[in-house]
Amino acid sequence: MNSVDLTADLQALLTCPNVRHNLSAAQLTEKVLSRNEGILTSTGAVRATTGAYTGRSPKDKFIVEEESTKNKIDWGPVNQPISEEAFERLYTKVVSYLKERDELFVFEGFAGADEKYRLPITVVNEFAWHNLFARQLFIRPEGNDKKTVEQPFTILSAPHFKADPKTDGTHSETFIIVSFEKRTILIGGTEYAGEMKKSIFSIMNFLLPERDILSMHCSANVGEKGDVALFFGLSGTGKTTLSADADRKLIGDDEHGWSDTGVFNIEGGCYAKCIHLSEEKEPQIFNAIRFGSVLENVVVDEDTREANYDDSFYTENTRAAYPIHMINNIVTPSMAGHPSAIVFLTADAFGVLPPISKLTKEQAMYHFLSGYTSKLAGTERGVTSPETTFSTCFGSPFLPLPAHVYAEMLGKKIDEHGADVFLVNTGWTGGGYGTGERMKLSYTRAMVKAAIEGKLEDAEMITDDIFGLHIPAHVPGVPDHILQPENTWTNKEEYKEKAVYLANEFKENFKKFAHTDAIAQAGGPLV
């Protein structure tokens, strides 16, 4: 089968009488309810559940091994190859399956707020609630949007279609398969809506660097003077909390590109975690959950239809999807200039990284590649001890290219635009987990504020002798003694032992990167 046949198949599918094109949020909400796909909550949002899969399925994600891309992809456990033949067989099956549905829902929009670099996308859904999710998460076309001649990337989403690993070349009945040559993503066997969002992000992480644009898994905001700040950080580091700032406007909460003219949001909406969400702690997210929003796997009271954000009955990974304009404090369109400050957030449960340090370009590249945080792992006896977690470029599951490509682009951007880079530890102080305490949020906010407002540019710096980090001697609103982690530990020997242990974990993790010896030497720990 050749690509002409695939295109013809797709056109035949899109013109089927059962296809509903570009329905409004209200129309899709009606469809969700009439088709019993979800319920309406007390605030007017749609709530859907996703069955067995309440998160991504990384082991079921593949990239088609094609002539034009096979020498560019960083093949391995994240980017698993699948043959063109297997893809085309599955494609035919999925298209046939979708044609037989009573109704299909199609959204046509974009990824990328900057018109120069936007990618047209077409999302074909078996479920109306998935189409509402896509409509609210991606960029919705406006009346004056020019028709693009570029062929769209198409998502074919068939959650109730299940693959047969014996004949289809998959690992299970679930599959997420990207073909760059056919500009197609096949998703089947999972109802988790986040697969659509992250598949488009993975594609942009391949396409944007080819145009000399750094694609980034980060949030971004801008101050009144046009000063842009980027926030990188893995789950639990405080990225959402710290980038939602009443004095600054949100550019985006999760995915961005950095071009020659500045930063732009890749999406048109937000996909916020909502476990333990409260109006007091995160009013912007809480108040965005209204008519047109989608709640995923959130427990809702049968009678009052009120959401219970503290209940993790379905999963800890409860989510809300809503268009970005449901937040008041935003930039429109979602673009701004070059960043003046970049913040890497980590939650170090060993309690040995400083609460804030300023990084050289090489250190920035090193810590970007490392993508460190720690998580607390339970044991049978209920005792918890920290575990190191490294996620390359703070977004390892979504990077099709070798890691050094992104790190070198970051280094180049820092050189060209003079951004200051900071490593901020939102984790433990005065000892590790169990003996120390979590860094006070008010202190972290004060440190981040000082960093992004340029107040640390001329600060006196003290160089840490284990990690080589440059720690400010003073930060407005923060007690001086907590800035040096060793000062907060009663047992200095134990501090040193734990710090050297973590430094060695960094070095061990860094061995996996090719073409990075110079970065490791200039940016890594000193011990």
From Swiss-Prot:
Instruction: List localization entries.
Output: Cytoplasm
Which UniProt keyword terms apply here?
ATP-binding, Cytoplasm, Decarboxylase, Gluconeogenesis, Lyase, Manganese, Metal-binding, Nucleotide-binding
Q: Can you supply a Gene Ontology BP term from the record?
A: gluconeogenesis
Q: What residues does substrate bind to?
A: 56, 192, 198, 319
Instruction: Quote any Pfam family the record assigns.
Output: PEPCK_ATP
Q: Name one GO cellular component term.
A: cytosol
Leader peptide range in chain numbering: none
Pathway per its UniProt entry is: Carbohydrate biosynthesis; gluconeogenesis
SUPFAM superfamilies per record: PEP carboxykinase N-terminal domain, PEP carboxykinase-like
Q: What is its EC number?
A: 4.1.1.49
Catalysed reactions listed for this entry: oxaloacetate + ATP = phosphoenolpyruvate + ADP + CO2
Residues the entry annotates as binding Mn(2+): 198, 217, 254
* Chief location bin: cytoplasm
> Which Gene Ontology terms cover its molecular function?
ATP binding; metal ion binding; phosphoenolpyruvate carboxykinase (ATP) activity
Provide the residue positions that the database annotates as binding ATP. Answer: 198, 217, 233-241, 282, 319, 444
- Classify the source by domain of life: Bacteria
Q: Name its co-factor(s).
A: Mn(2+)
Cofactor comment text: Binds 1 Mn(2+) ion per subunit.
Q: Which family does it belong to?
A: Belongs to the phosphoenolpyruvate carboxykinase (ATP) family.
Q: Which HAMAP family match?
A: PEPCK_ATP
Q: What does this protein do?
A: Involved in the gluconeogenesis. Catalyzes the conversion of oxaloacetate (OAA) to phosphoenolpyruvate (PEP) through direct phosphoryl transfer between the nucleoside triphosphate and OAA.
Q: What is this protein called?
A: Phosphoenolpyruvate carboxykinase (ATP)
Task: Give the originating organism.
Answer: Bacillus subtilis (strain 168)
